[in-house]
Design a protein with these regions (language model features):
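Alpha-helical substrate-recognition element adjacent to the catalytic core
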Residues: 1-84
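C-terminal cap/substrate-recognition subdomain and adjoining C-terminal extension
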Residues: 55-152
Length: 152
């Protein structure tokens, strides 16, 4: 939860907290377990697309037990600035490069980025976008949607 938790997680426990540098990070351990399980699925390729950039695999993974130290990092500095939102350009370039049959994009800002929503609508069934509430984080229902999408 990037802005601190609000209430309880829907994962069956309260949020855990750890300080990483100057940032307090809140997370649900069950969510981390599910992300680790999903990332180990054959054919599934996770990438980091976060303003944390290299700090995510370097510090966040160790702090919360996420097995994402070796996931590729899409960086702001590698974008050409052709889009209003650098993350949209980054994911477009990554998808063009790797050509996955399906893609899932989870970002708490996603629901507020009209150009990203329009691009995903254009792609249609090939992409699933999830924009979790930043005060609740990724919910159990979000993970179920991801699994159904990947299995579909």
């Amino acid at each position: 939860c990037p802005f601190g938790p609000e209430g309880f997680s829907d994962w069956g426990t309260g949020f855990e907290q750890v300080e990483i540098g100057m940032l307090g990070v809140h997370w649900a351990p069950e969510l981390v377990e599910e992300l680790n399980r999903l990332s180990a699925r054959p054919g599934v390729h996770f990438v980091w697309l976060t303003s944390w950039e290299d700090m995510a695999p370097k510090y966040l993974c160790h702090a919360i037990g996420l097995e994402g130290r070796h996931w590729p990092v899409l960086r702001y500095s590698e974008q050409k600035g052709t889009r209003e939102w650098w993350k949209l350009e980054a994911i477009q370039r990554d998808i063009s490069r790797h050509r996955p049959g399906r893609a899932v994009w989870i970002d708490d800002q996603l629901g507020f980025e009209e150009s990203a929503l329009a691009w995903m609508a254009f792609l249609g069934r090939g992409i699933l976008g999830i924009s979790p509430d930043p005060r609740r984080g990724i919910a159990r229902a979000d993970i179920l949607r991801v699994e159904a999408f990947l299995d579909g």
